[in-house]
Amino acid sequence: MRFPSIFTAVLFAASSALAAPVNTTTEDETAQIPAEAVIGYLDLEGDFDVAVLPFSNSTNNGLLFINTTIASIAAKEEGVSLDKREAEAWHWLQLKPGQPMYKREADAEAWHWLQLKPGQPMYKREADAEAWHWLQLKPGQPMY
């Protein structure tokens, strides 16, 4: 081995052994904010697909909360050209006299008055219905 490579190896070993540990926690990192100054708090600990961005324009400024999953999908679709769909232009519904608003079923029952016996329910429940529970939606999941 050459002298410069040995010298470099010894210098590297000495510098890494003599380096002082870095203090990652300091008291300057926590801000002392009085309780009266706090307007609100939003916990985003479990939401990994929420980003908070500062926003300002000529009329408004504030914080913008975005769903990063939807934003990344939209960014991928930016290169897709937007073509118009084939659709009829909007117009008022026009019905001729006697024309029905909708078509009936082919095998519909004949019309009759609803007859309920005492104690008879208006409808029957499903045999294997799920137990009642609160609706749970994951972040970014649509309502329907």
Curated annotation (Swiss-Prot):
Q: Which GO terms describe its molecular function?
A: mating pheromone activity
What InterPro entries does the record point to?
Mating_factor_a, Mating_factor_alpha_C, Mating_factor_alpha_N
* Entry keyword Signal: yes
Q: Which UniProt keywords apply?
A: Cleavage on pair of basic residues, Pheromone, Repeat, Signal
Q: Which Gene Ontology BP annotations are present? A: mating; pheromone-dependent signal transduction involved in conjugation with cellular fusion
Gene Ontology CC, one term? extracellular region
Q: Which domain of life is it from?
A: Eukaryota
For whether the record's keyword set contains Signal, the answer is yes
The residue range of the signal peptide is: 1-19
**Task performed by this protein:** The active factor is excreted into the culture medium by haploid cells of the alpha mating type and acts on cells of the opposite mating type (type A). It mediates the conjugation process between the two types by inhibiting the initiation of DNA synthesis in type a cells and synchronizing them with type alpha.
Free-text domain note: The mating factor alpha-1 precursor is identical in S.italicus, S.uvarum and S.cerevisiae, except for the number of tandem repeat units: 5, 3 and 4 respectively.
This one is known as: Mating factor alpha
**Species per Swiss-Prot/TrEMBL record:** Saccharomyces uvarum
